[in-house]
Amino acid sequence: MSLCGARANAKMMAAYNGGTSAAAAGHHHHHHHHLPHLPPPHLHHHHHPQHHLHPGSAAAVHPVQQHTSSAAAAAAAAAAAAAMLNPGQQQPYFPSPAPGQAPGPAAAAPAQVQAAAAATVKAHHHQHSHHPQQQLDIEPDRPIGYGAFGVVWSVTDPRDGKRVALKKMPNVFQNLVSCKRVFRELKMLCFFKHDNVLSALDILQPPHIDYFEEIYVVTELMQSDLHKIIVSPQPLSSDHVKVFLYQILRGLKYLHSAGILHRDIKPGNLLVNSNCVLKICDFGLARVEELDESRHMTQEVVTQYYRAPEILMGSRHYSNAIDIWSVGCIFAELLGRRILFQAQSPIQQLDLITDLLGTPSLEAMRTACEGAKAHILRGPHKQPSLPVLYTLSSQATHEAVHLLCRMLVFDPSKRISAKDALAHPYLDEGRLRYHTCMCKCCFSTSTGRVYTSDFEPITNPKFDDTFEKNLSSVRQVKEIIHQFILEQQKGNRVPLCINPQSAAFKSFISSTVAQPSEMPPSPLVWE
């Protein structure tokens, strides 16, 4: 680390130990590469990622209909037509108007699309008497991802021209179980307030309840994810690894403080933007922790490679330690650029884990089902081979391997917590870099950097899921969700709805959910 970085480090540590202090602020040069570049720790990043303008690519925002009311005049009166990126364009950046600029002149939209969009705006007036002012259409642009329980597209918000992500939650009201799961995810997305956890910026206006089948959630648009970065050919510096791991654990500490288990932490669910800010996403499998150990929990969780041994061994009760196991697997994958435990089946998955950690004690297997214990005890007794972790890469230093070994502990009660992992010295440089040039919680002044009083905040009160206890029918949940969405509407913003006449929308509507191969595999039935 440079002298400047070391100086910032000393000041940051002073802030970490209790006062606010400052570090020199400078200018950040933008790099256009697949792998986001980290700003040096002593420089301040002045720009929000949404404000990166990519040369040679214009954002097309089409005004559709001018409203004359003063409320409408205050809002941007435009319906967004797709700002299509050239298929050959490689950069993962999305254009948007610079701060304070109106969207530039757009290519003319086909007349029928304009007419259809205008008709849609009108059509929504009588349906939503609670928002008499107006509504704006949002038009899908291109698919950017398929989660376990939804499809994600990039869109342009017609109110400010910003690029955002639109997630379609399909088949919401098929049965009571899917209703509850979607409502839980929706409530979580609206509850989260943390820079390393994806949250809802907005929810599109629902139609009349009789036509209410899908839910559309607007979130920040992220350019990549950790899976794409890991499999890319670009080298990952130890600084990248530290700042990514720091943010994963920072987000996880917040989730766990809310009493939430994510239950599907994997590289593809860790979104990364163009300046390396990371956000945990996809809460389709998340739930509140179960404190009553006699209550059974579902085992259909976590993609196999990242699945903790207690789940593989059929434990009917598990804790947030399952997420830490997944983070350990990802940490090793960041270091070695390959999946740590890449097995063909759940039984082989368990065998690969015991090859590394050695045969677990009976105490460590106390929550396992009898069939799983028998499988372990039938096999040969294995010695641990943890020193092999040093061969992952030259970045697998003593500090790195020490932290990794605290995460990859067979017994979940002895596995390190997110809070304690964040206090590990390996992450000091990641914390420094994040808070001196990447975060939104600290800021730079003419005299230097002013640090937040709490580098890794938690939430209080916890996320409350008691609302689920009283949900008894699909129609009842549908009405409650419909009302919940209407209540979420921020009063100061024009409500958004989709233009159902557009070709892009029809493609979006018909886009399918993840194929079965992408779903977490079914649990192993131990004999």
UniProtKB/Swiss-Prot annotation:
Keyword hit for Glycoprotein: no
Residues noted as binding ATP in the record, renumbered to the chain: 144-152, 167
InterPro entries to which the protein is assigned, alphabetical: Kinase-like_dom_sf, MAP_kinase, MAP_kinase_CS, Prot_kinase_dom, Protein_kinase_ATP_BS, Ser/Thr_kinase_AS
UniProt biased composition (Basic residues): 26-54, 122-131
GO cellular component: cytoplasm; nucleus
EC number: 2.7.11.24
PTM-bearing positions, type Phosphothreonine: 298
Short name of any one Pfam family annotated for the protein: Pkinase
Bias-annotated ranges (Low complexity): 103-119
Name recorded for this polypeptide: Serine/threonine-protein kinase NLK
Annotated source species: Canis lupus familiaris (Dog)
